[in-house]
Amino acid sequence: MIHNIRYRLFVYEDENEEELIGGLKNILPTAKIERELAEGMMEDEIIILSGKIDKKKETKEFLSSLLSMDKLSLEKLASDLQKKTDKSGNLFLRFSKTSACEEKWEICDVGDSIHLKIKIMAYPAKKEVAIKLLYEALNEVL
């Protein structure tokens, strides 16, 4: 159901990079992280951690873990699918950095988070088709 998952995480100067990598690995245990340095508006150093997961086994494990979240979180996700899915069938999720570091999954709507771009295997690759597949998967567990 998932073709690939792209992820991105910003580490600011006042954050612990290793701790945030641990949080990312809580959500994506097999992540092979690429590290890039950038400069913020105030000339502060920002580390960008990113990468892509495209192995079927790994994307299936992610989906299984996602669908194991508590009912309230899954119901909120189901109600937000229209605004979290683009016209090409990509699902955009953000996970709380703090919760991820505490080995919990919490979908959030704030910018300072772990960003996931999840390409849904929808044929044709359209928003409506992807949302239908996502609703079907969510309805199996709700």
At which residue positions do the language-model features occur?
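Glycine-rich, aromatic-bearing surface loops/beta-hairpins
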Residues: 93-142
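Short glycine-/aliphatic-rich beta-strand segments at the starts of folded cytosolic domains
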Residues: 3-10, 49, 87-93, 116-118
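Mid-chain, well-packed structural core segment of small domains
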Residues: 66-100
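Short, charge-patterned binding micro-sites
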Residues: 34-58
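Long, hydrophobic N-terminal alpha-helical segment
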Residues: 1-35
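Short amphipathic alpha-helices in soluble, non-transmembrane regions
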Residues: 21-23, 62-70, 132-135
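Beta-strand elements of well-folded, non-transmembrane domains
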Residues: 9-13, 28, 55-57, 97-101, ...
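Short, conserved charged micro-motifs
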Residues: 16-19, 57-63, 102, 126-131
